[in-house]
Regions:
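Acyltransferase donor/substrate-recognition loop-hinge adjacent to the catalytic core
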Residues: 9-21, 167-245, 269
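Flexible loop/turn segments at secondary-structure boundaries
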Residues: 32, 95-98, 147-149, 198, ...
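A conserved beta-strand-loop-helix scaffold within acyl/acetyltransferase catalytic domains
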Residues: 39-82, 89-99, 219, 224-328
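TRNA-binding/sensing appendages of the translation machinery
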Residues: 3-5, 15-59, 128
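Acyl-donor binding region in acyl/amide transferases
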Residues: 98-181, 297-377
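Catalytic cores of nucleotide-enabled group-transfer and carboxylate-activating enzymes in metabolic
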Residues: 25, 29-32, 45, 51-63, ...
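Active-site proximal loops enriched in glycine and acidic residues that flank catalytic Cys/His/Asp
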Residues: 248, 274-275, 283-289, 325-331, ...
Length: 393
């Protein structure tokens, strides 16, 4: 690990010992590789786990490549018993989050653990001690590495594969975390529906709103990518500002996320709503590339040959479901049905493009306005994710 990387990864001065369990900080690239690959041990026989791309995980956790690290400190910990890795956790101080919310919160995330409460307790003790050492008063998570990325622990809905950029974990994680003294902070919902036409009444209301509104709905123009990203960014920061857990993305973070997602975007499913040229809402629906990534076991190449890449290209043609991953409306335009218009238009386009159905995720459990809209569109709630909290003291 480079000197710059070491400076970005804070750690306690000595290993934490808990009986036969030793928790140590990740301080070099080799340990970071072990940290990432430990997931394969946990999910070895799990039918629903989708292995992440190893290349992407290394880039995500590399402070020199991920702009999140410009305003955050991240400590990665590995738990070992008799030299064998049995757990991992990340502790995060996001200075932008704490500044925005005037709080002293540490995230925890990237949690993986064998089914042993002593191992889990040792990992959370390491995270708590790290956070206390930085003057932080509470833990919140799982966040991988913030609410702008993967969020929450799956607590309901273990019988199907996760969609792209949604979390997945063994059912026993919730019990482990609660036995370590954490409690519920917030639940998040995921919803599913087929690509069948929207309910007649819902569609009729949305069509009437659209016909009598000066709002125009259009597809994102990827040939004018940077300008479109600027418009979406404006809506994103305004629409989500009051949401629980929200933290504004920096310019560099948003631009990187946009570049990363561009390869997955189908222009017909990336919608902007505008009024007299002003962007007021947007929705983003992407094909569920997890259906293809599941076939790769985390690798695009094998022995230098692009075997994984060829598999990805082949199975990408067979993707038959989508994920509506973002839908936001500026505050001054809410309760005018713009969200319903975007949902109906998305459903129709998904059907026209030949997909079989998809997921809407995630929504806050207490966001009644958007949850009612999603339910009225014919969606059924299929998964529940939980964010936990605890004091560091």
């Amino acid at each position: 690990m480079t000197a710059a990387t070491k400076a970005s990864v804070a750690a306690p001065s000595a290993p934490l010992e808990k009986g036969k369990i030793e928790v140590t900080p990740v301080l070099d690239v080799a340990d970071r590789d072990r940290f990432i690959k430990f997931s394969w041990e946990i999910y070895r026989n799990d039918l629903h786990w989708v292995p992440p791309l190893l290349m992407e995980r290394h880039e995500f956790l590399d402070p020199s490549k991920n702009p999140f690290f410009l305003h955050a400190e991240v400590a990665l910990f590995l738990a070992r018993r008799a030299g064998e890795i049995v757990g991992r956790i990340a502790a995060v101080e996001d200075r932008n989050f704490n500044s925005f919310h005037r709080s002293r919160v540490a995230y925890f995330g990237l949690f993986e653990c064998v089914n042993d409460v002593q191992v889990a307790a040792a990992l959370f003790q390491a995270a708590r001690e790290w956070a206390r050492g930085r003057g932080l008063e509470s833990l919140l998570g799982p966040m991988n590495l913030s609410t702008n990325y993967e969020v929450g622990l799956l607590v309901e809905g273990f019988d199907s594969d996760p969609y792209l950029q949604m979390t997945y974990n063994p059912p026993y994680y919730g019990e482990l975390i609660e036995k370590c003294g954490l409690e519920k902070a917030k639940d998040l919902y995921a919803w599913e529906r087929s690509a069948s036409p929207p309910p007649e009444r819902f569609a009729r209301v949305a069509d009437k709103i659209r016909a009598h509104s000066e709002v125009q709905i259009r597809s994102v123009n990827l040939r004018n990518f940077e300008a479109e990203v600027t418009r979406i960014k404006e809506v994103y920061n305004a629409a989500w500002e009051k949401n629980w857990g929200f933290v504004p993305m920096t310019e560099k973070e948003f631009d990187k996320l946009a570049r990363d997602l561009r390869q997955f975007v189908v222009p017909a499913l990336a919608l902007l709503a505008e009024c007299q040229g002003e962007p007021i809402a947007f929705s983003l629906t992407i094909p569920d590339y997890n259906q293809a990534l599941k076939k790769l076991n985390g690798r695009l190449t094998t022995y230098g040959l692009p075997i994984g890449l060829l598999k990805l290209l082949y199975f990408a043609r067979k993707i038959d479901r989508v994920r509506l991953m973002a839908l936001g409306v500026k505050a001054g335009w809410r309760r005018r049905g713009i969200d319903a218009v975007l949902v109906v238009e998305t459903i129709r386009r998904v059907h026209r493009l030949g997909y079989q159905g998809g997921e809407v995720s995630w929504t806050l459990e207490d966001n009644d306005l958007i949850n009612r809209t999603i339910e009225a569109s014919g969606c059924t709630r299929t998964k529940r994710y939980r964010v936990y909290r605890a004091q560091t003291g």
